[in-house]
Regions:
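N-terminal membrane-targeting/pre-transmembrane regions
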Residues: 1-49, 129, 154-156, 171-173
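Canonical hydrophobic alpha-helical transmembrane segment
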Residues: 52-68
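Short aromatic/basic micro-patch
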Residues: 76, 95, 148-151
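ATP/adenylate-binding site constellation spanning eukaryotic-like Ser/Thr protein kinases
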Residues: 79, 98, 154
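Non-transmembrane, membrane-adjacent beta-strand/coil modules in membrane-associated proteins
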Residues: 84-145
Length: 173
C-alpha cells in the first residue's frame, strides 16, 4: 500500500552568485579547450597536453556545472515521517520519525551566519538541509541537536508536519 504524501518539494540551487562563479570558472576551461584543442593554438605560458586539457575540460567545464544543475533537495512529509533526500549525496532518503520530534517551528534564519551557507551544513544551531532562501522548519528532538529543513514553502511544510504528527497519533490510538 502506497503511503499518502502530505507534502513534497523539490528545490534546486538558484543563487545567481553561485551560478556566476561556477559558469565563469567553467568558461575559462571552455576557452582553453576551444583555443588549444580545436583551433590548435597554445593556451597559457606553460600549456598542458591536449589530452590533459581535454580531461580537465570535461571535469570542470562540463561535469562541474552539470553537477550543480542536477543537485537537488527533495523533502517529503508522510504520516508520521519526514524524508529528506539531497541528490547526489544521499543514496537513500534521510528518514526522520516524527515521534522523535519534541517540537517544531517555522523559522527565518541566516544561511551563512547560522549554518555557513547552503547544502548539507552543520553550524552553531545544529544541522541544516537547505538549497536557497532563508525560511524553513526547525525540528527540536528529545535526544539530539536541532535539524533545520530549508523550504521555499515553509508554511506548507510546517502545516504538513503538524498534520503528519496528528495522523500518526490518531492511527496509533
Amino acid at each position: 500500500m502506497a503511503e499518502t504524501v502530505l507534502f513534497q518539494e523539490k528545490q534546486r540551487f538558484r543563487q545567481l552568485g553561485l551560478w556566476t562563479v561556477v559558469l565563469a570558472f567553467a568558461a575559462i576551461f571552455w576557452v582553453g579547450f576551444v583555443y588549444q584543442v580545436l583551433l590548435s593554438g597554445t593556451y597559457g605560458n606553460n600549456p598542458v597536453s591536449d589530452v590533459e586539457l581535454s580531461v580537465v575540460f570535461a571535469v570542470v567545464g562540463v561535469y562541474l556545472p552539470l553537477f550543480f544543475y542536477k543537485m537537488n533537495l527533495t523533502t517529503e512529509v508522510l504520516p508520521g515521517m519526514l524524508q529528506v533526500y539531497f541528490s547526489p549525496f544521499h543514496l537513500n532518503p534521510v528518514r526522520v520519525p516524527l515521534r522523535l520530534v519534541r517540537t517544531y517551528e517555522k523559522v527565518v534564519y541566516s544561511p551563512i551566519g547560522d549554518y555557513g551557507g547552503w547544502g548539507i551544513r552543520w553550524g552553531r544551531k545544529g544541522k541544516a538541509y537547505n538549497m536557497s532562501g532563508n525560511e524553513g522548519v526547525e525540528l527540536l528532538f528529545y535526544n539530539k541537536k536541532p535539524l533545520l529543513i530549508g523550504s521555499q514553502r515553509a508554511h506548507e511544510l510546517y502545516q504538513a508536519i503538524r498534520q503528519a504528527k496528528e495522523m500518526k497519533s490518531e492511527i496509533g490510538s
